[in-house]
Amino acid sequence: MLEAMREKPPLVHCITNYVAMNIAANVLLASGASPAMVHAPEEAGEFAGIASALTVNIGTLSTQWLDGMRAAAKAAASSGKPWVLDPVAHYATAFRRQAVADLLALKPTIIRGNASEIIALAGGESRGQGVDSRDPVEQAEDSARRLAERQQAIVAVTGAVDFVTDGNRAVRIKGGSVLMPQVTALGCALTCLVGAFAATAPEDLFGATVAALATFAVAGEDAALGAAGPGSFAWRFLDALAALDGEALDARARVSIA
């Protein structure tokens, strides 16, 4: 799937936050996809119809950005394009809770979040603080299954060991590095990469989500080998993504049935 993406780079419409734009765009470029950071409500809907996939991240939310998100999500849904929701800290304020409720009504095909975000999104009590998760991934697995069934979507919970489910099937993905949470917006960039893989294999969104997370995990392991800390890890991670090929990914991905 990684090689297929590079042979035919998908145009990925990324509505993400200010903090994430640079790293998200570079992650897509290093992986072989084509990013577009378009969020104005005057054009977001039209652009979503042009792109191969849409990703929506509510990290730095505003009324204007939310209008763009709704317009893009409506366009993606009506045209059958995959779209990914990243409900960053949706539990933190009433504005965020309502925004995510509105976006969930537009039926995202994939939802990616940390454990605290997924637990809360499924109706549970999470220990999240701001954008940071205080819950381990394993405690979010049942919540992810329920959310996937309720939304008829793929749900990915990312953390030390990632978890992906469609409500019936479920897998865990191991790998990555302890340095990854120390680089801001890597999770947001992962959401965009999930969109790129979904655009490449819209007929297999479960497999596309797993492939994106496995790509991040393997690249994270490679980047950590020579990194002295989060600063050198960040640029090494982009190099590792660019150097990774499909054969190495297939050989090294640590995916197990959950």
Swiss-Prot record:
Q: Which GO terms describe its biological process?
A: thiamine biosynthetic process; thiamine diphosphate biosynthetic process
The positions annotated for binding substrate are 37, 185
Q: What is the lineage of its organism?
A: Bacteria, Pseudomonadati, Pseudomonadota, Alphaproteobacteria, Hyphomicrobiales
The positions annotated for binding ATP are 112, 158
| Enzyme Commission number(s) of this protein | 2.7.1.50
The name on file for this protein is Hydroxyethylthiazole kinase
The text of the family note is:
Belongs to the Thz kinase family.
Q: Which Gene3D superfamilies match?
A: 3.40.1190.20
Give this protein's Gene Ontology molecular function annotations: ATP binding; hydroxyethylthiazole kinase activity; magnesium ion binding
Its biological purpose = Catalyzes the phosphorylation of the hydroxyl group of 4-methyl-5-beta-hydroxyethylthiazole (THZ).
Q: Where are the transmembrane segments?
A: none
UniProt entry tagged with the keyword Kinase = yes
- Name the coenzymes or cofactors required: Mg(2+)
One Pfam family assigned to this protein is HK
What's the top EC group for this one?
A: transferase
Q: Which UniProt keywords apply?
A: ATP-binding, Kinase, Magnesium, Metal-binding, Nucleotide-binding, Plasmid, Thiamine biosynthesis, Transferase
InterPro entries found in the cross-reference section:
Hyethyz_kinase, Ribokinase-like
Q: Quick one: which pathway?
A: Cofactor biosynthesis; thiamine diphosphate biosynthesis; 4-methyl-5-(2-phosphoethyl)-thiazole from 5-(2-hydroxyethyl)-4-methylthiazole: step 1/1
Catalyses which reaction(s)? 5-(2-hydroxyethyl)-4-methylthiazole + ATP = 4-methyl-5-(2-phosphooxyethyl)-thiazole + ADP + H(+)
